[in-house]
Amino acid sequence: MFLGLPEAAESEGFDRETLDMPAKQIALLEAVAAENKNVVVVLSNGSVVTVAPWAKNAKGILESWLLGQSGGPALADVLFGKVSPSGKLAQTIPFDINDDPSTINWPGEEGHVDYGEGVFVGYRYYDTYNKAVDYPFGFGLSYATFEVSDVKAVKTGACTASVSAVVKNTSNVTPPKPCRCTWLLARPT
């Protein structure tokens, strides 16, 4: 089942007042899920939407964002198992819009919002202030499963490190990218 944001909610030059999906779409999902428990939701949206309020009605959720002209065949390949999904979230999905630090300064004055979060934008805010989130920055699943062992990190310079690990694919699925490493440079804010 495809769900997403209507064109009126996707724009430059104004901010959305909510991260919620349209109520009519949630009602449709609930009606379909009441008849068939094997519902997979494919999201089509240009910005974050909350999924916690309705995720219980879906066996799976695939965020496709706003696909381009070749998006349909690529999405079909993922849905039918020809390729394994490998995308990672480029942002954090909070449980509620009020969990996001940008709401402190919103709606601003006369259409202008003061971006006062400083370096505490996105995951930095949630990590620093130990805020629970629905899906963290970098989250992503695959049809493949892995076993990771012998993880080692060695500082090699002021701002460099060497990281190694043994990653074993424990499934019959070949993923495009088996492993990702993210590190944080500790610095004063």
Predicted regions span which residues?
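A cross-domain feature marking catalytic cores of carbohydrate-active enzymes
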Residues: 3, 43
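Glycine/threonine-rich flexible loop motifs
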Residues: 5-22
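Redox-cofactor binding/interface segments in oxidoreductases and associated redox assembly factors
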Residues: 1-2, 63
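Alpha-helical scaffolding segments of alpha/beta enzyme cores, especially the outer helices
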Residues: 24-34
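Active/binding-pocket-proximal capping segment
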Residues: 9, 18, 180-188
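A short helix->loop->beta-strand "cap" motif at the edges of active sites that frequently abuts
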Residues: 34-39, 58-59
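Short, glycine/acidic-rich beta->alpha junctions
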Residues: 20-24, 70-71
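Secreted, periplasmic, or luminal enzymes acting at the cell surface/secretory milieu
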Residues: 44-176, 180-184
